[in-house]
Amino acid sequence: MNKVGLIVPTLNAGRMWESWLKAFSRQTRKPDYLLVIDSSSSDNTVSLARAYGFDVQVIPKSEFNHGGTRQYGVNQLPNADIIIFLTQDALLASFDAIERLVAVFEDEQIGAAYGRQLPHTSAGPIAAHARLFNYPAESQIRSLEDKARYGIKTV
């Protein structure tokens, strides 16, 4: 079975963080490695993450960048076969979201996968449209042959 790592960059995750952690703890497939990379939060983000079993690496806020911080996390999990990136405000829509995301990698032709992002209930019309347009309800498998049709959205 593939070893799965989860990486969540955080900064002052606030009131929603404990709800996120509670919802995550009910997932049917638990990742083997749980890593929060925190950008020096001044609230209880770090202590809550640790209470829910996450390893926490704290970095200076000035060192955060989206790609580099995530790569730093990947480097911290050398034994993970699959890496899942989540954000501190992305609530998983179902209790089997991780399980379903990981299952696609049973097909050795699959190199990357992502879950559907739904708009928050408070999202404005533009944000809601962007999520619904970019993340349709149907599962899709794409290959490099689809590049002419989908461009950057091929992967």
Protein language model features and the residues they cover:
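Hydrophobic targeting segments
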Residues: 2-8, 23-24, 32-37
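Short, well-formed alpha-helical segments that are part of the catalytic scaffolds
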Residues: 12-26
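Acidic helix N-cap motif at the loop->helix transition within catalytic regions
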Residues: 18, 43-51
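A conserved acidic beta->alpha catalytic loop
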Residues: 38-46, 91
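Glycine-rich, basic loop-to-helix element that forms the pyrophosphate-binding segment
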Residues: 61-78
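Short beta-strand-to-loop acidic/aromatic patch adjacent to the donor-nucleotide binding site
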Residues: 80-91
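Conserved donor NDP-sugar-binding/catalytic core segment of glycosyltransferases
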Residues: 91, 95-128
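Short, flexible, basic/aromatic active-site loop/helix in glycosyltransferases
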Residues: 115, 133-155
